Amino acid sequence: MNSNTVSSFQDILKRMSKMQLGSSSEDLNGIITQFESLKLYRDSLGEAVMRMGDLYSLQNRNGKWREQLSQKFEEIRWLIEEVRHRLRITENSFEQITFMQALQLLLEVEQEIRTFSFQLI
């Protein structure tokens, strides 16, 4: 994974955790959990691309893999909509910056996952 992407994930997760601690009225657990899950999935997909010699095992689980990929794209779309919604309703500049960066990262990761998946197909 690109080191900028790793630091972006870590930075955004840290910021969202601070926002969660500062605001008991807004529950960010779901978004934080989804971000962590997306990071792990993106990492594992990148590793699979780098291990192209493992193509036989990938072909054996290809049906399940495609289903998981579809599910991840649904999760990304949900996260994008949730982040956009929170961006519209917040007036706090720290939160606005965090959600803008999160939105940018989600769009980048979506593109990376698409690129990886095309390499694996």
Swiss-Prot record:
InterPro entries: Flu_NS2 (IPR000968)
UniProt key word Transport: yes
Extent of motif Nuclear export signal: 12-21, 85-94
Keywords: Host nucleus, Host-virus interaction, Transport, Virion
SUPFAM superfamilies for the chain: Nonstructural protein ns2, Nep, M1-binding domain (SSF101156)
Gene Ontology CC terms, in alphabetical order: host cell nucleus; virion component
Localization: Virion; Host nucleus
Domain of life: Viruses
Annotated GO biological process: exit of virus from host cell nucleus through nuclear pore
Keyword presence, Transport: yes
Family: Belongs to the influenza viruses NEP family.
Subunit structure: Interacts with protein M1. May interact with host nucleoporin RAB/HRB and exportin XPO1/CRM1.
Full protein name: Nuclear export protein
